[in-house]
Amino acid sequence: MAAAAAATEQQSSNGPVKKSMREKAVERRNVNKEHNSNFKAGYIPIDEDRLHKTGLRGRKGNLAICVIVLLFILAVINLIITLVIWAVIRIGPNGCDSMEFHESGLLRFKQVSDMGVIHPLYKSTVGGRRNENLVITGNNQPIVFQQGTTKLSVGKNKTSITSDTGMQFFDPRTQNILFSTDYETHEFHLPSGVKSLNVQKASTERITSNATSDLNIKVGGRAIVRGNEGVFIMGKTIQFHMGGNMELKAENSIILNGTVMVSTNRLPSSSSGDQFGGDDWVRYKLCMCADGTLFRVQVTGQNMGCQTSDNPCGDLY
């Protein structure tokens, strides 16, 4: 190789040497190989699939978009609620125009307020200012005050109070009880100025009136007076006015103690003619024993008296 190189240098020093086509091709191939090796120096082939991927891709990207959209919707709802509260409470540069908050826990409304349901806290008080009325109005609906099972309903045509234990009305200044249904401690009295009491059903031990006034019980339909251990009616004069029938029922006996008067003005009378010829009517005669016991005797003929063996008077007849 050294001799060939020396010969080549000797030939080249004498002048250009003509090379064959084969030698030129080999020389060109060697030059290109050397050039390519120099171009790829420091180059390392990298597989992109094996690289660490950064950012949110695939399902994580979709989840991130959903979270962002949800936060945006919540922000819009929060903005709407804030605007509504701002418009209702009327918050301005000088504070709240519709209400005041005090350090003692008092909440004061400075204008007409529209509310649905109010839930006061434990031992809370709802009231008005001094020398001013507290006006509570329901829009075509009753106003209901309720605490547990006790309820006060104020409607357009009536006011109803519902309670399991009872109720009391007292003067807030003097603390005097004006009206109470605690029969064990206070006797039931109608308030001053109240002339009548309208109830559907009343359960009590005794019903009395003043010594100078009458006790009137009036009903539009049917009145039922019932006692678990008997019914006692006492008075200077007792009158029953009925448009229909009066029925007295007792397990043991009915005692009428006093002067008993039966007005026959409204009793039906038979028409003239044959009074005992037809079978459509059954007639009775009202009789009384010496002790005041009333009984009836069926009338079967004319001029019939109360003499019958079947009577509660014993051997009197």
UniProtKB/Swiss-Prot annotation:
UniProt feature, compositional bias: Basic and acidic residues: 20-31
A GO BP annotation: muscle organ development
Membrane-spanning segments: 65-85
Organism superkingdom: Eukaryota
Matching InterPro entries: Sarcoglycan, Sgcb
Residues that carry a glycan: 157, 210, 257
UniProt subcellular location: Cell membrane, Sarcolemma; Cytoplasm, Cytoskeleton
Residue intervals on the Extracellular side: 86-317
Parts of the chain on the Cytoplasmic side: 1-64
Record keyword Hydrolase present: no
GO cellular component, one term: cytoplasm
Protein modification: Disulfide bonds are present.
Disulfide bond residue pairs: 287-313, 289-306
Keyword flag Transmembrane: yes
Keywords of the record: Cell membrane, Cytoplasm, Cytoskeleton, Disulfide bond, Glycoprotein, Membrane, Signal-anchor, Transmembrane, Transmembrane helix
Pfam families linked to this entry: Sarcoglycan_1 (PF04790)
Region of interest: Disordered: 1-31
Entry's family note: Belongs to the sarcoglycan beta/delta/gamma/zeta family.
Complex and partners: Cross-link to form 2 major subcomplexes: one consisting of SGCB, SGCD and SGCG and the other consisting of SGCB and SGCD. The association between SGCB and SGCG is particularly strong while SGCA is loosely associated with the other sarcoglycans.
Function of the protein: Component of the sarcoglycan complex, a subcomplex of the dystrophin-glycoprotein complex which forms a link between the F-actin cytoskeleton and the extracellular matrix.
The protein's name in its UniProt record: Beta-sarcoglycan
Organism for this UniProt entry: Bos taurus
